[in-house]
Each structure stands twice: as C-alpha cells, then as structure tokens.
Amino acid sequence: MADVRAEIDRCDRALIDMLAERFGYIERAWQIKLVHGIEANVPWRTQEVIDRVRDRAAERGVPPDLCEALWRQMIGWFIQYEEVKLKDQIAASNKKS
C-alpha cells in the first residue's frame, strides 16, 4: 500500500505543478482582459474548455462528470480571482485620474 500511496503523492505533486503553470496563464489573462476591456467571465470560453475536458477525460478513461465538476470549480475560482483583480486595477486607475 505504501508504494501506491507514494505514487498518488507523486501524481498530486504533478497536478500542483500543472496548476501553478495554469495559474501563471490566468495572471496573464486578467492583465490582457484589463487592457482590452474583456469581462472576467466569458461563458462561451468556459463551455469550450468544459467540452474539451470532457472529451479528453473520456479518451483517457476518467469519468467525464468528475472532470467537469473539478474544472467548473477551478474555472469558477479563477473567474472570481480575475474579477477581483480587474476591479482592483480599475479602482486604482480611477484614483490616479
């Protein structure tokens, strides 16, 4: 059992590494959205991501419903994060004006 747990821990570390990489792109995304006046929540993009995630999950033998639930949670968190960042940056810009 210890070897299985060690492999699960290894997978968890890899997931965190990938999440850190994704988070870096979220940081870039909100900055681009700020410059171009794009809302944090872009529903068509969310659906595009979910559809792709479900397809990939099915290809890999992972329950698509599980992956969709995880991604919706993650995307929802990132949208809230972007909304706060955008609001804070707009407020800071308005104070300077």
Give residue ranges: language-model regions.
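Domain-level signature for soluble enzymes in the chorismate/prephenate branch of the shikimate pathway
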Residues: 1-97
